[in-house]
Every structure is written in structure tokens, then in C-alpha cells.
Amino acid sequence: MNKVDSVKPRGFGFGFIMTRHVCNSATNELWQESYRCIRKYYPNTVKILIIDDNSKQEFVKHPNLELINTEIVQSEFPKRGELLSYYYFLKLRPFEKAVVIHDSIFIKRFINFSLLDDFCPLFSFKRNWDNPNIEIPLVKQLENSKLNRVYQSKEWLGCFGVMSIISYKTINFLQEEYNFPNKLISIIDSREKRMGLERILGLLYFEYCKKNSIKMRSLFGDIHNFIQKNYSIFGFHGWSCYFMTDYNAHKYLDTTPIIKVWASR
């Protein structure tokens, strides 16, 4: 039996942080499905923190969905995207371990996140698409000379979507050691910089593993391999699954633990 799929414990030492951006009725459906998937496998005692990043509030509606043990934070920092999950986790400390996800991530089976490491990306990716003109200035903002050198190495991987499992102890360490996430909250303000953030978190994870003598890994492996293994068997390319229409129209393997839907935001 896989360690993360063992018998459900009586108590849970983690919660979920979901970054939400609603810009139309189609994207309003995504976060609700993500919430329903969480509640299908995790009881109401598991808290969900939703960080709303500059949504158009006229589209944010859920008349048929009751939110239980859920806190919604309206961020005062628009367009920061996934960085907000780490910023508010550090600021609010809603639980001791966070599962950081997008509003377009749908969990399809129970995973005992409490048994996992204090820091682990959900997905990794190879660095074939690095943009040093964006990423190096972000690294320098963290004011750690060693990171500048490590960035040039080929040893570390990107953290797809900046999604991870991370403990409060770890996020506090990253803030004290590397000024992450607070130093970047005034810097990350575009899609390109949010893509750079995927590399920054991967770089910090690499450093964390070295300091703690931990082997680097990600929970679901390389995102490109994951897409091909779990989606393509049914005759369509996973990158083409947009919004709820495509999600509902396609079949997935029963063993697929998590599904990512694309929303082009």
C-alpha cells in the first residue's frame, strides 16, 4: 500500500490553500468543483483557505454550494497569483501544514498529506523554458548570494504551478533565510513573473533538500510525464483540457489522483 494512501487517520494536521481568480462564469465553476472534490475525500474538520486574487465579484456566485470550515481572504495584492498562498499562510497560520493548489485542480482520491514531508512540490518540470531575464532579478530580490550561484546550476527543477505541500515551520524558515515570500509580494505582478516564481520555489526546494539531506522529489512527478500517462491514453492531449466542458467530456484513469484543468488566465 502506498504510504500516502493508507487508512484515514482520526485527525488531520493539514489544510488546503486555494488561489482563486474568477473573471467570468466559466472560471466561477472551477473553484467550486475544486472545493467539491476536496470535500468528497476530506471531512469538514479539514479547513480550506481560499485566497481571492482580484476576481470580478459580479461573477463569484455559489447559490448551490455551502462552504463549510472555509475562510475566504480578499487579497490586497492583485495579480500576485500563487505567491499569495505562501504570503497568507505565513501571515495567518491557519494550520500547521498547507496543501497549496490552484482553483483548477481537482483531487480524485484520498491522499494522506499529513504523512508527507514538510516541503514537497506537487509537480516538477525540467528547465527547458527558463527565462533568465525574468528569473535572475527575482533571485536577487531574495538577497541571498548563494542562491545567485545555485540558480546557474542544472541540478534543480521547477515547481509547476508553485503548488506544494509545506509546513508552517518551513515557510517561516524560508522567510527568515531567503526573504520568501514577503520580499516578492511587491514584485510579482505579471504572468511572466509568476512563471519565474515556479523556478524560484523549485530553487528554494533544492536548497531546502540540501540543508536537510533529503532527496529531491515531487509528489506526482514531472508534469509533462504525468499528463501523458494519465490523460493521453483516452486519445486526447491533456494540455487541451480547458474549463468544465472539457473536464466533464473526457474520461480519466481510475488511478489518476489529481486532475489539472487549464483556464488561460
Language-model regions: role of each:
Residues 1-265:
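ER/Golgi luminal nucleotide-sugar-dependent glycosyltransferases, focusing on the catalytic module
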